[in-house]
């Protein structure tokens, strides 16, 4: 009897552990439609405890966010992370700027690429790594014109029609 209770507790602890690190992927579907994406980078995020809990629950959005350089550091702005209901009495701004964790060589490389006119850094994917930390994939992007977007839609429709045949 006692052994059965111990195995039930162990299995519950294992499932709780796996639920804590379930794969969470929050995508920016607008990015590939609005921009030409070239180079992709991955960086960690500086977050508070309640913010990482909201991200693990899938309550975040990166559709309208962008990255900017300030004082030799890269920051992501306008990224929405919902307030965690059990966070306590300290309210957090859901759209505050968050620092990206990058090495100095990566920051210099990105800064050179972004100096061109019309080039920016756009977040494409927010995910929780197997280590439990939140990571942000972002790309060097150049804006598309309206005729480029229409051409992309036509190509997508043609490929869909060909796959049906």
Locate the predicted segments by residue:
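Short small-residue beta-strand/loop micro-motif enriched in glycine and branched aliphatics
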Residues: 88-90, 145-148
